[in-house]
Amino acid sequence: GSAWSWMHAHPRPCCTLEQLKELIAWGDVIGAQKDDCSSQCIVYEVLASDVPGTFSLGGDLKLFVDLIRAGNREALLHYAVTCCDFLYEFSTHTKRPESMSISLVQGDALGGGFEGALAADVLIAERGTLMGFPEIKFDLFPGMGALTFLSRRVGVDRAYRMILSGNRYTAEQLHDWGVVDILAIPGEGVETVNAFI
């Protein structure tokens, strides 16, 4: 079977601390079922968004600014570690070694949102969606796995160039380069995932 997580961060479609905790809890629930397949084993974990036109815009920049202004290093570190915890578990399946992760990108995936999409075993994106790492444009870097996840798909040289450019790329470009595994027709992403499963 499959388990779908539909991201719906509020008030902005970014990686809020609440959303990250929910995603980790989602993985824990699936992991707890691995020894009891009496009803149906979860083989596929699908990460998607129900925000039209957006997968995820990445890190919660408002939270960053608020915590930096308040000098709250501990809370900022907690946020960063929580991001890493989710991406690590989603990409390695330590609690669910028999499962496969799928990211369905039906809208923009930027920064940490793109990292989340890249963390999956299979990245399915609708044509015309945009993905990239804009962090360099405001003197940051994507530090939650971007280089590792991207270099596995395109090599270290192209990964560095993509990260340092700050550019956004279409799903079609990324498919040509091997970043996106499967292209879907706009509006048919769910059907494409189900056909893959």
Kindly label every feature range from the protein language model:
Residues 48-54:
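Short glycine-enriched loops at secondary-structure junctions
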Residues 121-122, 161, 182:
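Well-ordered beta-strand positions
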Residues 1-46:
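Conserved CoA-thioester-binding segment of acyl-CoA-metabolizing enzymes
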Residues 47, 60, 116-118, 174:
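Hydrophobic/aromatic residues within transmembrane alpha-helices
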Residues 147-157:
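Hydrophobic, secondary-structure "cap" segments at the distal end of domains
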Residues 1-6, 10, 167-197:
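Amphipathic alpha-helical segments at domain termini/boundaries
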Residues 61-105:
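An acidic, glycine-rich surface segment that forms the CoA-thioester-binding/catalytic face
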